UniProtKB/Swiss-Prot annotation:
It comes from the Bacteria. Pfam families: CTP_transf_3. Pathway: Nucleotide-sugar biosynthesis; CMP-3-deoxy-D-manno-octulosonate biosynthesis; CMP-3-deoxy-D-manno-octulosonate from 3-deoxy-D-manno-octulosonate and CTP: step 1/1; Bacterial outer membrane biogenesis; lipopolysaccharide biosynthesis. It comes from Pasteurella multocida (strain Pm70). It is found in: Cytoplasm. Belongs to the KdsB family. GO terms for biological process: CMP-keto-3-deoxy-D-manno-octulosonic acid biosynthetic process; lipopolysaccharide biosynthetic process. Its main location: cytoplasm. It catalyses: 3-deoxy-alpha-D-manno-oct-2-ulosonate + CTP = CMP-3-deoxy-beta-D-manno-octulosonate + diphosphate. The gene is kdsB. GO terms for molecular function: 3-deoxy-manno-octulosonate cytidylyltransferase activity. Activates KDO (a required 8-carbon sugar) for incorporation into bacterial lipopolysaccharide in Gram-negative bacteria. This is 3-deoxy-manno-octulosonate cytidylyltransferase. Its EC number is 2.7.7.38.
Length: 258
C-alpha cells in the first residue's frame, strides 16, 4: 500500500469568488467537504494550508491539521513548499496536492495519483480524462494534455492538441461544425491533481518560471521545461466540476443538497 500525505491549499482571497473555502455547501464549508474526501482516500495525513486565520479556525473546528502560510505566494506549489519546510516533511514522502475548491473530488483518484507516482520513475504524476465534447476541446479553460504511448507527458496546453490538420481544416470558417466532430482517444483533459515527492517541491520553486508556463499560464510546464518527466494516467472516476465561479458553486450545491 502506498503511503502519502495530502496538502490542501486553501487561499481565501479568490479573485472570482472571495472567501471561497468557507462557502457553505449542504450545511458545511467547502473546505470541510474537500477535507472529508481527502480523508476517505486513505491518506496517512491531511493538512489544510491557508493564508487566512478565519479559514484556519474553521478547519481546526472540524478536526483538520492546519499550517498557516504566507499571503504572498504566487502559486499553490509555493504554498506547498512552505508547508513541507515548516513541518519538516521527509524528502521522499509522497505529497498529493488537492485544490481547496474540489468538494466533489472522488477519493479513489486521490489514491490513484499517489500510486501513479510510486509506480513510475518521474518527478510528478497527474491524471486525465478523455475529451468527447468538441466544445470542451476548443475551450481554453479546459487544459489539454498530450502524452506518449506510455503515458509520459509531451505537453500541456489550453489549445486543442494534437491539431488534426485534415479534420479541423474547415473549422476557422465553419465553427458550427464542431459539434459534429468525432474525437479520437488522443484528446485528453488534464485534471488538476498532482503527486510529487516533498523534496521535488522544494526543487521546483528554485527554478525560474519558464517562458512556456507564462504564455499558457500553466505552472506544470515548468517541470517539462527543465527536462523532468510527468506521468499521466486516465482517472478511474471522472471528477465532477470544481468551483471557480458563483455558477459553479450553485451547481455543486444542487448536487450535494439532493
Amino acid at each position: 500500500m502506498t503511503n502519502f500525505t495530502v496538502i490542501i491549499p486553501a487561499r481565501y482571497a479568490s479573485t472570482r469568488l472571495p472567501g471561497k473555502p468557507l462557502a457553505e455547501i449542504a450545511g458545511k464549508p467547502m473546505i470541510a467537504h474537500v477535507f472529508e474526501k481527502a480523508m476517505q482516500s486513505g491518506a496517512k495525513r491531511v493538512i489544510v494550508a491557508t493564508d487566512h486565520e478565519q479559514v484556519a479556525t474553521v478547519a481546526r473546528g472540524f478536526g483538520a491539521e492546519v499550517c498557516m502560510t504566507s499571503e504572498t505566494h504566487q502559486s499553490g506549489t509555493e504554498r506547498l513548499a512552505e508547508v513541507v519546510e515548516k513541518l519538516g516533511i521527509a524528502e521522499d514522502e509522497i505529497i498529493v496536492n488537492i485544490q481547496g475548491d474540489e468538494p466533489l473530488i472522488p477519493p479513489a483518484i486521490v489514491r490513484q495519483v499517489a500510486e501513479n507516482l510510486a509506480k513510475y520513475q518521474v518527478k510528478m504524476a497527474s491524471l486525465a480524462v478523455n475529451i468527447t465534447d468538441p466544445e470542451e476541446l476548443f475551450n481554453p479553460n479546459a487544459v489539454k494534455v498530450l502524452t506518449d504511448h506510455a503515458g509520459y507527458v509531451l505537453y500541456f496546453s489550453r489549445a486543442p492538441i494534437p491539431w488534426h490538420r485534415d479534420q479541423f481544416a474547415s473549422l476557422p470558417k465553419e465553427k458550427s461544425t464542431r459539434g459534429q466532430l468525432v474525437l479520437s482517444d488522443h484528446y485528453l483533459r488534464h485534471i488538476g491533481i498532482y503527486a510529487y515527492r516533498a523534496g521535488f517541491i522544494k526543487q521546483y520553486i528554485q527554478w525560474q518560471p519558464s517562458v512556456l508556463e507564462q504564455i499558457e499560464s500553466l505552472e506544470q510546464l515548468r517541470v517539462l521545461w527543465y527536462g523532468e518527466k510527468i506521468h499521466v494516467e486516465l482517472a478511474r472516476e471522472v471528477p465532477p466540476v470544481g468551483v471557480d465561479t458563483a455558477e459553479d458553486l450553485e451547481k455543486v450545491r444542487s448536487i450535494l443538497e439532493k
